[in-house]
Amino acid sequence: MSQATKRKHVVKEVLGEHIVPSDQQQIVRVLRTPGNNLHEVETAQGQRFLVSMPSKYRKNIWIKRGDFLIVDPIEEGEKVKAEISFVLCKDHVRSLQKEGFWPEAFSEVAEKHNNNRNRQTQPELPAEPQLSGEESSSEDDSDLFVNTNRRQYRESEEESEEEEAA
């Protein structure tokens, strides 16, 4: 199986199905990623340990700090105590909350996590006085997309007058 085909099936599996954790599985939150496909997680009871990412998810699914996972316990591990079995997206979290499988300790964290992802990052620009006629329609750029990853340079009237005089 080629890498592209494998990626397609893994992504389809993660995004498509809604899974319910079994008795042995746990829902955990990612705290940090120390590397080597290991992730430090915290359970709803506050217990911290390392989990490993199976090879089918490596280079196909990316896990960030604050994401939620379903993990299977590993009995022979000292430091690594579980393996990731499913990565939960916000739709999965909502369905687990509706079905009553979501831990109460993660309820507030999940709400904050969803709100931060949905929040718009565009800063509001100060409103400029409206001009009449054609000038206002040609110079009104407030409905255009603003790239927040770039610096915004503002020209003062003095600079523009100096450029026109030269």
UniProtKB/Swiss-Prot annotation:
It is found in: Nucleus. Residues 156-166 have a biased composition (Acidic residues). It holds the Pfam family eIF-1a. Residues 5-89 form the S1-like domain. The modification Phosphoserine is found at residues 132, 136-138, 156, 160. GO terms for cellular component: cytosol; nucleoplasm. A motif (Nuclear localization signal) lies at residues 6-12, 56-65. Keywords: Nucleus, Phosphoprotein, RNA-binding. CDD domains: S1_eIF1AD_like (cd05792). SUPFAM superfamilies: Nucleic acid-binding proteins. The modification Phosphothreonine is found at residue 33. Residues 114-166 are annotated as: Disordered. GO terms for molecular function: RNA binding; translation initiation factor activity. InterPro entries: EIF1AD, NA-bd_OB-fold, RNA-binding_domain_S1_IF1, TIF_eIF-1A. SMART domains: eIF1a (SM00652). Belongs to the EIF1AD family. Interacts with GAPDH and STAT1. PANTHER family: RNA-BINDING PROTEIN EIF1AD-RELATED, TRANSLATION INITIATION FACTOR-RELATED. Plays a role into cellular response to oxidative stress. Decreases cell proliferation. This is Probable RNA-binding protein EIF1AD. It comes from Pongo abelii (Sumatran orangutan).
